[in-house]
């Protein structure tokens, strides 16, 4: 079970302004279309998302949604304050590892992002962490 940093998600009430800031000030560019996840609008994500990159790590700029947990039925809300995300090659083994560590998590499956099995959980300070695996759907 390998883990690799995949993206940083920042939530905003103004995605367009955030996009301009990261492109103009930090000179980040577009993510390659082949690297972009297919989003399931209305199932976790609502609104436009911007994807920028430094060429190595993606940054997902998403609309802030403080009511996401109520809408999705999930305990962990990755769209309230954002999150950091890791990609794994074995999501089942990772969930078993979380169970063994006694860490509760929300299993989103592929509801929000088609082809990604996502789980979200909190670190000791309440920061949201995502771990996902690319899966066939």
Model-derived segments and spans:
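N-terminal beta-strand motif that seeds the catalytic metal site of vicinal oxygen chelate
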Residues: 1-19, 32, 81-86, 136-137
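Short loop/turn microsegments at loop-to-beta-strand junctions
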Residues: 6, 47, 116-117
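Core segments of cupin and vicinal oxygen chelate
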Residues: 9-57
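Short amphipathic alpha-helices within nucleic acid-binding modules
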Residues: 21, 92-97
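A short, acidic/glycine-rich surface segment
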Residues: 35-40, 67-72, 107
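Short acidic/polar mixed-charge low-complexity motifs
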Residues: 55-58, 125-127
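Vicinal oxygen chelate
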Residues: 95-137
